[in-house]
């Protein structure tokens, strides 16, 4: 629901103003092993791939993935405690957190009990690669959809280059096991940025919950239990046109082709199509760069010879 109590149809809700406020304590256990402890009134637990807006493979794409609530919707959790141990190419993380999704009021803090938990394992086989597997139990995450969720994800990310000349790709699979059924999602996305120009793409297959997409034209009842996937393919491009004092402005456009299951075709048709034309404005990145692929419980600097958190000015 939005702030006026209306259902969200064909769009994502905006994120809360505060997405991460965290205190991080790191200590070296020896030359190759580190321990990290994080406490955050708002932040991300150890669950899912790097959130979509922080992935280089999705940085130019202005649209949230359809599978956001199967992979990384917990990145704004109001109450998180995470502990992590990293050694060489490996990092293991565990979290307890408030599993409830933020409400429709975007300017406040939605604190709650630390009633959910998760674990995540990272492996960096080479400088350009990072793999993760994670699982977590979310207690009553959705106000309008009572029930608990066990979420499991696996993903692989690749990044080559630096600055404004890079190529990136991410592939992921996720599953939500709910009290009333199971939903799966998969995505493949990539980006190539060179100089002032960038191109990007994303393919998704998501087993949607029809009730979340219902309009007056969609039949209620058995349709709400459909597990046929929605397919989506997006292709787009962006060009930087403004630059000054660290600010970056770009114009871009993309188009998305869909294939919908039969239960949704009365409202959406068999092959809906959408497009964006947009202007993107980025503030100065600071001395650390944009730090794409960063996460809240990042390993200590120097404890891995193969970091994926490339600085992107």
Regions from the language model: what does each represent?
Residues 37-41, 85, 96-98, 133-137, ...:
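Transmembrane beta-barrel strands of outer-membrane/channel proteins
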Residues 15-21, 75-81, 86-88, 113-117, ...:
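Residues that define the transmembrane beta-barrel architecture of outer-membrane proteins
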Residues 42-46, 65, 76, 97-108, ...:
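Sequence/structural signature of outer-membrane beta-barrel proteins
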Residues 31-35, 45, 85, 89-93, ...:
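Repeated loop/turn-to-beta-strand initiation elements of outer-membrane beta-barrel proteins
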Residues 1-19, 135-145, 166-188, 195-233:
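Outer-membrane beta-barrel translocator/channel fold
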């Amino acid at each position: 629901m939005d702030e006026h109590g209306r259902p969200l149809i064909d769009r994502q809700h905006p994120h809360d103003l505060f997405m991460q406020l965290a205190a991080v304590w790191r200590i070296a256990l020896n030359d190759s092993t580190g321990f990290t402890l994080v406490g955050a009134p708002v932040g991300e637990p150890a669950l899912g791939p790097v959130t979509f807006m922080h992935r280089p493979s999705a940085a130019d794409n202005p649209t949230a993935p359809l599978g956001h609530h199967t992979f990384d919707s917990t990145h704004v959790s109001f109450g998180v405690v995470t502990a992590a141990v990293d050694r060489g190419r490996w990092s293991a993380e565990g979290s307890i957190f408030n599993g409830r999704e933020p409400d429709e009021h975007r300017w406040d803090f939605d604190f709650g009990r630390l009633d959910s938990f998760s674990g995540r394992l990272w492996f960096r086989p080479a400088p350009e690669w990072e793999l993760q597997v994670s699982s977590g139990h979310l207690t009553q995450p959705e106000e309008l959809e009572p029930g608990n969720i066990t979420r499991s994800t696996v993903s692989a990310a690749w990044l080559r280059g630096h600055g404004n000349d890079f190529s990136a790709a991410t592939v992921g699979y996720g599953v939500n096991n709910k009290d009333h059924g199971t939903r799966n999602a998969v995505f493949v996305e990539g980006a190539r940025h060179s100089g002032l120009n960038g191109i990007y793409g994303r393919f998704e297959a998501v087993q949607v919950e029809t009730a979340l997409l219902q309009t007056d034209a969609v039949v209620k009842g058995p349709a709400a239990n459909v597990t046929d996937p929605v397919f989506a393919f997006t292709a787009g491009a962006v060009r930087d046109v403004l630059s000054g004092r660290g600010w970056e402005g770009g114009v871009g456009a993309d188009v998305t082709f869909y294939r919908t299951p039969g239960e949704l075709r009365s409202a959406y048709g068999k092959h809906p199509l959408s497009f964006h034309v947009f202007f993107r404005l980025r503030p100065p990145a600071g001395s650390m760069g944009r730090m794409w692929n960063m996460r809240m419980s990042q390993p200590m600097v120097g404890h891995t010879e193969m970091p994926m958190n490339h600085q992107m000015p």
